[in-house]
């Protein structure tokens, strides 16, 4: 795997992460479609994810939490808006409160695109924020480093599936 680039665009209110993998597009798609594979890489190594619901269809929803080094378990949700298997999906990604309900605030819109390459697949994650303040807040929370750490785990998951 090669993390090609991470780019923040304050004018467009986006953060784009591009990575390439030595695996076919269907295999990379399964990293998103299979909740057991997804939870093996979604989140940095020190904050593993547990998906309690994962309905990857338009109008579907995913619920998850991450477990931190001190046992804290912040929750998150995805509202699935578009699915074009095996090349594209769009989710609204937000935090949940302690009861598991969507927390106040605008979710981040995350678009995932997968493109076939000779001998592999390019994955592009484009996160679009509601405001510059939201983008800044997520950067301060470590989103950029967290995504890089998460993506670094993908090769191991792909190797086991091969």
Identify the meaning behind each predicted range.
Residues 1-48:
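Hydrophobic ligand-binding cavity/cleft-lining segments
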Residues 28, 38, 62-64, 80, ...:
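Hydrophobic pocket/interface hotspot
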Residues 16, 36-75:
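Short beta-edge strand/loop motif at the mouth of beta-sheet-based domains
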Residues 19, 51-54, 76-82, 107-115:
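Hydrophobic/aromatic beta-strand elements that line small-molecule binding cavities or substrate pockets
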Residues 25-26, 56-57, 81-88, 113-122:
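A short, structured loop/turn motif at beta-sheet edges
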Residues 18, 92, 99-145:
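Beta-strand/loop substructures that line and gate deep hydrophobic ligand-binding cavities in soluble
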Residues 9-11, 56, 70-74, 102-106, ...:
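A generic structural micro-feature
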Residues 51, 158-162:
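Short, highly charged C-terminal tails/helix-capping segments
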């Amino acid at each position: 795997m090669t993390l090609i680039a991470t780019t923040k665009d304050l004018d467009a209110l986006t953060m784009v992460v591009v990575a390439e993998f030595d695996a076919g597009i269907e295999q990379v798609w399964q990293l998103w479609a299979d909740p057991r594979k997804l939870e093996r890489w979604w989140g940095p190594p020190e904050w593993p994810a547990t998906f309690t619901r994962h309905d990857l269809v338009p109008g579907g929803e995913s619920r998850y939490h991450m477990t931190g080094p001190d046992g804290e378990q912040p929750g998150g949700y995805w509202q699935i808006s578009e699915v074009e298997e095996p090349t594209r999906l769009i989710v609204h990604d937000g935090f949940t409160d302690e009861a598991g309900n969507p927390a106040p605030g605008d979710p981040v819109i995350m678009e995932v695109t997968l493109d076939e390459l000779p001998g592999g697949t390019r994955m592009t994650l484009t996160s679009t924020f509601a405001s510059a303040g939201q983008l800044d807040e997520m950067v301060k929370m470590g989103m950029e480093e967290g995504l890089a750490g998460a993506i670094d785990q993908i090769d191991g998951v792909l190797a086991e599936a091969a």
